[in-house]
Design a protein with these regions (language model features):
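A short acidic, Gly/Pro-enriched loop at the edge of an enzyme's catalytic core
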Residues: 1-11
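A short SAM/SAH-binding and catalytic strip from SAM-dependent methyltransferases
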Residues: 9-22
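A short glycine-rich, Lys/Arg-flanked "PGG" loop and its adjoining helix->strand segment in the class I
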Residues: 24-39
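Short, glycine-/aromatic-enriched active-site segment of Class I SAM-dependent methyltransferases
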Residues: 45-67
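Short alpha-helix
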Residues: 68-84, 90
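Conserved Class I S-adenosyl-L-methionine
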Residues: 89-154
Length: 154
């Protein structure tokens, strides 16, 4: 990050660190730009395990068409601890988000679908339904596990 050391009291991220492949470099850079006593807080999508995603998760990521570099809670814990952070906390939000995503899928497939298709195009809405079906599946399996991440620079 193009900031001087110790520039910030807080670094916050929402749904963006999923696109950074090197979580150790991320943690080190966040640590560098925080002032002593500073906090890191993020909400992002994690994968439940280290290593390659399952076929179902790979198909979901492919459907999204994004460059996800998902890491496990353990990988984040290790990266932030090794960078020097204390009080590293990861809170799994899968149960909450699974419920939300399932309701969104029901809505996409329900009575609103025709109007959505008229407004946004049938092909687009059909693709959204495909994505949400895959998303709900990997959420239900627990492999896709959105988390809140918090850590403190001593």
């Amino acid at each position: 990050m193009p900031f001087e050391d110790g520039s910030f009291d807080i670094v916050f991220s929402k749904d963006s660190i999923i696109h950074i492949p090197d979580k150790s470099a991320l943690a080190e850079d966040v640590f560098r730009v925080l002032k002593p006593g500073g906090h890191f807080a993020a909400s992002d999508w994690l994968i439940s395990h280290a290593g390659q995603p399952s076929y179902e998760m790979s198909e979901y990521i492919k459907a999204e068409g994004l460059d996800f570099a998902m890491a496990s809670p353990g990988e984040y814990q290790e990266a932030f601890s090794k960078a020097g952070f204390v009080d590293v906390e990861l809170v799994n939000r899968n149960p909450w988000y699974s419920s939300i995503a399932a309701k969104e899928l029901e809505w996409l497939k329900g009575p609103e679908r025709e109007g959505l298709s008229i407004r946004h195009g049938k092909e687009f809405i059909d693709h959204q339904v495909e994505i949400w079906e895959k998303l709900v599946g990997v959420l239900k399996s627990g492999e896709h596990c959105p988390h809140h991440i918090r850590a403190k620079k001593p």
